[in-house]
Amino acid sequence: MLIDLLNHRRAVRHYSDQPIDADTVRGCLEQARLAPSSSNMQLYQFIHVTDAATLQALATACLGQQSATTAQQMVVFVTRQDLSRKRARAVMALEADNIRRTSPPEKQEKRLANSRAYYGKLLPFVYARGFGLLGLVRKTLFGAVSLFRPLYTDCSEADMRVVVHKSCALAAQTFMLAMSEAGYDTCPLEGLDSRRVKR
């Protein structure tokens, strides 16, 4: 039951040397892909680290925290807003297939047009970045339109960065719950040198 998982899952600071099955970790990452994400865009990537030298470098980048220095494996959750156009096209293709399979024939064309407008035009515009200027343009444009009808107005570049991070956090939480169900403990880490982690 979910309550059992929630009661079991804790941020563990010191790991035993009990071997961890890498296939189980990969399976839990597949479950994490099922987490909800904004517009199903999944603008994140999971990097499963098992190499000893890379683990040591990550532990150093994590400021020597015990949960990092004793971990046999790590997963780095990376936001990937740069994939927005590619992911929008992929989701639009899935939507089109779903509409053709499940929608009444007389409603298909309108639903396909709505999907093309949303995933083909709106989302690429909303997720695009350009030194803060595109966010300012979006904020101004959407703010003006919202005077006349309800409209999403939290669309600055900072707002969209938050959206991507929230979706990634949902995937990370789903992963931690899946690991708990598999009988493993986890610890989310934030205190780190992100420049070193990126290397």
Give a label for each model feature:
Residues 1-199:
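Acidic, surface-exposed loops and disordered segments
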